[in-house]
Amino acid sequence: HLDWKFTVFIPDFEVSTEKARGILPQGYPRSEAAANTAHAIMMLKGLADGNERLIRHGKKDCIHEPYRRTLLPFFDSLQNLFETDTDGILLISGSGSTCIGISKKYLSEQAKQKITGLEGSISIRELPLCLKGASVL
């Protein structure tokens, strides 16, 4: 949907895929796996339709985020600053350490300053929406 704004937050450290996978439990209850699948579908529908309510439900991740957020000491503060300032959502991108914010407006300059003052160095990049989709180069 054309209304979405995407902001990535790139800290000055990496989280290896091995470390990010190693922190996850060996298995999950079926109910958690089913809930996560439903949330992913809500996220996709919310993004396609511009529906903030659906992306808020869709961001609920019980498979990865509760564990991987512990590898990112800044995550809770960043999430609070981003979501308060933009009324959007913040997610861990892949295994981390990059996070992505999805909202209908970009961060204010005041919020950007607060974020750059968090633990470590965090680069903030506002990304344009790509309407072309996936392609082979």
List the model feature ranges, each with a label.
Residues 1-2, 117:
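A generic structural signal for short, non-catalytic loop/turn and secondary-structure boundary residues
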Residues 3-84:
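Acyltransferase
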Residues 47-137:
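Glycine-rich, charge-dense phosphate/pyrophosphate-binding loop(s)
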